[in-house]
Amino acid sequence: YFTNTLVTYLPSLDETSRRRRAERPEKPQAATVDNYYLVKVDVKEANNVAGIFLPGLELAEGTKLSFLFNPQSDIFSLTCTSDYIERGNFFVSDLNVSSRNQGDSISLYLRSDDIFVGGVYMPDFSVQGGVKENQIRLATRFNNKENGAYALISTVSTLQSDPLSGIPQLRIHFYPSTFGTDKQIWALGAKEILYDSTRMVVDSFMMVSGKQRLVIDGVASHSMADTLHLRMDNFDLTPLSQITDRQGYRISGFTSGSADMAAALGRGVLYANIAFDDIRVNDIPMRNTVFRSKWDFNAQRALFELADRQQQTPIVQGYYQPSERYYR
C-alpha cells in the first residue's frame, strides 16, 4: 500500500509503478466509502523500546501519531505531535507534523520550536510543501531571535532515474531564497544541484550580499577525477556563527580565497589558499592570517599551514592522513 501510494506521486521511485498500479483490481466506488483504517500510537514510556528499533532514540512521553488511510481509494491523513524527539546530535522540540493526499498531490506541514541537527540550531522552524508528478516543492524557514539570524529557502526537486545506471537522482532548483542577520541579507541559490547515492553535482551554488560572494561549483564523489571548487570574495563569516554559537564561539570577520577538493566524498584531497581578515572570536581580535593546504602524493597526506599574513611566519603547521583519519 505504501509503495503504491508513493509511486502515485513519485513514479520515478519505481520504473514498474505504472504496470503494478494497472494490475491492481478496480473496486466499485461504493466499496471505497467505509474501507478506512486508523492507526494510533500514544507514547507513554517508550525510550527503552524505541532504542530497539533505532539505538539512542528518545521520545517524549505523550508523543502521538495518528494515521488514517483507505487502501482502496489511496486516501490518507497523518498527524504527529511530540514535546521532543532526540537521537545523537539531532533534537527537535514541540514538533507538529501533518500530511494528507488530495487528488493528484500530497501536502506537508511541519513546525517545531527548536531543531538542532548537524551542529546547526534553527529555532521557530517550519516546512511547507507538496509532492506531485515527481516533484517535491518545499519552503523552509527559521527565525533565531537571540542572534537575529533567519532564513527562507524555497526549492523544487525533481525525482528521476539516471538513464544509464537507473540510479534514482534528485535534481534541485531554487526559488528566490535568503539568509539574513539583523545587519545584512544574503541571497542564495544555484543553477542546479544533482544528487544521487554516488555523487553530487553542484552548478554554481552562491551566497551573495553586495560585493561579498561565496561560490561552490563542481562534483563531489569518491573519485579523484571529480573536484569540488570553493571561491570566496570578501565573504562575511557571520553565517558561520549559526553553527559555532551553540559551542560557545561567536565568530566574525571576512575571508577571501579558494579551495579545491578532489574525491570530496572519499579521502578528500584538498588544495587551499584562504586569507582571513579582521577575525574576532568572542570579541577577541585575532591576527590576519592565511590558510594553505596542498597534497603530498608521496606520503598520501594533506599538508596544511596557518601563517601570519604580515610576517609570513607559520602559526600552525601539520598534516592530515585520510587513510587513518589522523591529524598532527
Predicted regions and their residues:
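Interface amphipathic segments
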Residues: Y1-S258, L265-R328
